[in-house]
Amino acid sequence: MRIISLNAWGGAMFDDLAPWIDACGADVLCLQEVTHTPGLGGWTRFDDADRSLPQRANLLADVRERLPHHHGLFTASDAGPVQDRRRRFHRQDFGLATFVAEDLPVVGIRSAFVHGAYTEHRDRWPNGGRPRAALAVRVHDRRAERFVTVVNLHGLRDPRGKADTPARQAQAERLADLVEGAREDGDLTVVCGDFNLLPDSTTFKTLADLGLTDLVGGADTRTSRYPKPLRHASYLLVSDPGAVARFEIATAPEVSDHRALVLDL
C-alpha cells in the first residue's frame, strides 16, 4: 500500500501537480490546503494580510476528476472570499481531502477540529489562528490482511513562527484523541500532514505516547518555491516502523511549496 501526504498549496502549481497526481500511484492520497468553490472551476485568487496567491477554484473536483477510481473525502475547516479572473467574489471552502483507492474497503471515517471550530470569514481571511481539522480514514488492506488507519492533518499556522504554544499543545491533545477514537486495536496507524511545527515540538512526545514514530525528523520538507530559511513543516508517523518498505521525502518533481511524503508499506 502506498500512502502519500502533500500540502497541495491550493493547487497553485496545478500544471505540475496534475500530471504528478496521474502518476503518483497512491492508494491513499492525503492532501492539505484543498479548495472547493461550489459551481466554479478554473482559477481564483486568495488574499490575506500577508499573501496573495493563485489557487484552483475547486481543487477537490480537479483531483477527483484525475482519480476516478478513488473515493474522495473532504472536510472543510473554514471558508472565505476569493476572486475569479474577472474580480468577482465567491465563497471558497478550505480544508483537507483524502482519496482512497476503490479496492480498499473504507470501514471507518472520522474528522475533528484540532484547533478552533468551523468559521465563515465574511470579508477577509485572517493571516493566523485559523481553524484546523484532521480527517481519519480506516481501511482494510486485503493484500496484507490488516486494517490501516490514516490520519490527515493540517496544523495551526501562527505568523510568529512554528515554535510550541499553548494552542499547539491543545492541538496535539485533540489530535491524539482523534487518533485513539478512529483506530482499533491492532491497526497499523499512520499520521501525516503539514503540522506547521519544529522537529523538537512536544507534539511528537504526545504522539509517541500513542506508539507513533516520526520518520521525518529534521529533514527539509520544503521546495524551492518556499523562500524562507526554516525548512520544517510536514511529518509522517507510523505505529510500526517494521512495516515500512520505503519512505521518501520527494525532491522532484516540485508540485507545491511542500515536498510530498511517500510511504510504501
Give, region by region, the residue ranges found by the protein language model.
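Active-site beta-strand/loop signature of hydrolases that rely on acidic residues for catalysis
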Residues: I3-N7, W20-R51, F99, V137, ...
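Short, flexible loop segments at the rims of nucleotide/cofactor-binding pockets, characterized by
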Residues: S5-G10, P126, D164-Q169, G193
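Structured beta-strand-rich core segments of catalytic domains in phosphoester-bond hydrolases
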Residues: G10, T35-F147, I249-A252
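Short, acidic/polar
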Residues: G11-I21
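Active-site environment of divalent metal-dependent phosphoester hydrolases
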Residues: G11-M13, H36-G39, G80-V82, R157-G161, ...
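Charged helix-capping and loop-helix junction motifs
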Residues: S52-A57, P166-R174
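Metal-dependent phosphoester-hydrolase catalytic domains
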Residues: L104, D177-V190, F195-L265
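Metal-dependent phosphoester/phosphodiester hydrolase catalytic core
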Residues: H121-R122, P131, R142-Q169
